[in-house]
């Protein structure tokens, strides 16, 4: 089991506290394993596992607990039997109707430490904000980073070089279960395709009561094909009209919002770096796992530049950065990254194979006058740093402990 220390470092200070720990992320990204890791850490700190109550609401044996009252009654009864402080672990809590009322009541009435997971960003809005406002901390869990992937892949192929590991990562992505399939191509693609269908059906269509399945599938296919490119709902509406589908841009944006709430896509806003304002249109979208893209759409190697961008973007999110696309004049910076007092800029490209490419990638920083770190990241093996702008091989960049 991968320790996932990046997340445990953030969660550890909250272990045993009265704050509710909420872990969200796309289906099958490893949230259940995080609950196991937390239980393991608590046990090592002296907590008896007899004090744990763990329920996975996708398990049919708990189907009788899918209302707030039924769950509350069951947990209250079991807590009395255990006596003392109890540690509650609820996996995929969104399957329980009005679950936030139950969680709030348990928080108030029991001596307990609560951990929950869910596959929808709306988990933390609406009713939850009303009942639990200021009483929870959220941790977004992502598929494996390249470093985590390489650790597992080398347990299967111990002689694999870093280059070979990265080549596999480009196609397989970071979904944890693939290690159980030993990263075999056909079973891995089948698993990822089925996972994609499950996210589309359970977390997007059913949750949002979408009836126009064909339209949803077309919109998702379009975004997957165009990850990392500037998006316009109006342009997509025109494209669909040419295919005899008349749809309003607002409907398209709503459907994409549902996909983002299910953590299938991430939206990246564009920022005017000179005017220091977020632009209202032409955002970009990246997919939660590029392995899913390869399984359902293909073409990761053909679209290598966009896939490298996708990989770097997810790594920036993992490390806690808020990310925008920067615009300065007629130039664009792939990622402008902020985290408290930290800031850095990242340009991503496939290869710096010509003077034109070098000038474009490094020249994007010409009008940025601050002293924050500026990177150009590519698959090139040789360091081409210049004028204070750091060039890094993408593998080294992803594996670095920190960027400075």
Identify the residue ranges that each predicted region occupies.
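Short glycine-rich substrate-engagement loop in P-loop NTPases that contacts/grips substrate
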Residues: 54-84
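Hydrophobic positions on the alpha1 helix immediately C-terminal to the Walker A/P-loop
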Residues: 34, 38
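Accessory nucleic acid-recognition modules appended to NTPase machines
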Residues: 183-343
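Catalytic cores of nucleic-acid endonucleases
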Residues: 326, 350-395
């Amino acid at each position: 089991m991968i320790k996932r220390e990046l997340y445990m470092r953030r969660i550890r200070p909250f272990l045993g506290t009265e704050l509710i720990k909420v872990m969200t992320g796309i289906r099958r990204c490893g949230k259940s394993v995080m609950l196991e890791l937390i239980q393991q850490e608590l046990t090592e700190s002296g907590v008896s596992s007899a004090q744990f109550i763990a329920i996975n609401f996708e398990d049919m044996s708990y189907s009788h607990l899918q209302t707030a009252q039924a769950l509350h009654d069951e947990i209250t009864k079991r807590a009395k039997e255990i006596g003392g402080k109890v540690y509650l672990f609820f996996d995929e809590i969104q399957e329980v109707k009005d679950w936030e009322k139950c969680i709030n009541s348990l928080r108030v009435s029991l001596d307990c430490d609560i951990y929950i997971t869910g596959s929808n960003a709306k988990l933390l809005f609406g009713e939850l904000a009303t009942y639990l406002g200021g009483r929870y901390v959220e941790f977004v869990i992502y598929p494996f980073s390249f470093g985590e992937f390489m650790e597992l892949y080398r347990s299967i192929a111990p002689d694999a070089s870093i280059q070979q590991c990265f080549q596999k990562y480009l196609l397989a992505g970071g979904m944890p279960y693939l290690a159980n399939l030993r990263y075999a191509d056909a079973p891995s693609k089948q698993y990822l395709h089925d996972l994609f269908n499950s996210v589309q059906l359970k977390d997007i269509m059913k949750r949002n009561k979408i009836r126009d399945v064909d339209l949803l599938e077309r919109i998702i296919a379009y975004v997957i094909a165009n990850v990392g490119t500037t998006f316009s709902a109006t342009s997509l509406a025109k494209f669909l009209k040419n295919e005899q589908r008349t749809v309003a841009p607002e409907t398209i944006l709503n459907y994409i919002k549902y996909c983002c709430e299910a953590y299938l896509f991430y939206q990246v806003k564009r920022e005017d770096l000179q005017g220091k304002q977020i632009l209202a249109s032409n955002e970009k979208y990246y997919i939660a796992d590029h392995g899913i893209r390869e399984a359902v759409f293909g073409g990761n190697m053909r679209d290598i530049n966009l896939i490298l961008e996708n990989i770097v973007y997810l790594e920036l999110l993992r490390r806690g950065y808020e990310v925008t696309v920067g615009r300065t004049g007629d130039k664009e910076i792939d990622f402008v990254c902020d985290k408290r007092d930290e800031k850095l800029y990242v340009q991503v490209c496939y290869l710096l194979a010509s003077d034109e490419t070098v000038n474009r990638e490094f020249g994007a920083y010409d009008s940025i006058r601050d002293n924050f770190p500026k990177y150009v990241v590519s698959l090139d093996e040789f360091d081409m740093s210049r004028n204070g702008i750091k060039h890094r091989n993408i593998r080294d960049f992803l594996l670095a402990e920190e960027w400075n």
